[in-house]
Amino acid sequence: MGIPDIRAILFDKDGTLFDFHRTWMPGYRTIAAEVSRGDAALAARMLAATGLDPITGKLDPVSALAAGSNSEIASLWAAVADVGAAEAIAERLDSWFGAPGAIIPVPVTDLAGLLGRLKTRGLRLGVATMDSHAAAIRSANEFAFHHHLDFIVGHDSGHGHKPGPGMMTAFCASVGIEPRHVAVVGDTPHDMGMARSGGAGLAIGVLTGASPRFELEALADHVLDSIGNLEVALGLA
């Protein structure tokens, strides 16, 4: 298909700006082991209940681990572990991932360089994540691209959750650009669902997250190996 008149780009964070598996799975395994009190079989069941295939090690792209919030993960883990303390688990997830040095984000490319070039082209840029708003800001500051962003929204920002249109609608309202001029870039069907429900001009899938190519190809206008190929895909390189 041809490239529409794109004036803004809304990026997912984990699996799109950052390699999902290398960044997040070590932490989820650590907290699952903690909640299960070292019971490896129980920890495996908890991870499986939230989307991790115990045989292949792959994630279900629409699972809680791949596309949900810490609250969703905690509710499922509490049910499997029969501990009845979902709020406490969610708080532990938030505090663990929010602690300095707890995770080592692995960017898929030079984020400051890429977003800086896109900004120089006059594009408005945003991040919509199922992580918290505060965590998204920390990542943007840590990798020196916060000043290139016009908008950041998290699952706790009050604009709903993917695949609903709320996050995208809020982005469009914030930057004053109609949805048909927006490209949404993400790694899961939920990201593509947000693009479609929000009326985005382009839905672009990337393979640095939980979803295989065939799954994204059924939903996206384009599927890229990573956002490192985005400028070429948009005709900007």
Whereabouts are the PLM-identified features?
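Conserved phosphate-coupling serine/threonine residues in phosphotransfer and NTP-handling enzymes
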Residues: 16, 129-131
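Asp-based, Mg2+/Mn2+-dependent phosphohydrolase catalytic module
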Residues: 1-9, 22, 37, 116-120, ...
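N-terminal helical cap/lid subdomain that shapes the substrate entry/recognition surface
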Residues: 3-121
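Residues that cap or flank secondary-structure elements
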Residues: 65, 106-107, 128, 159-160, ...
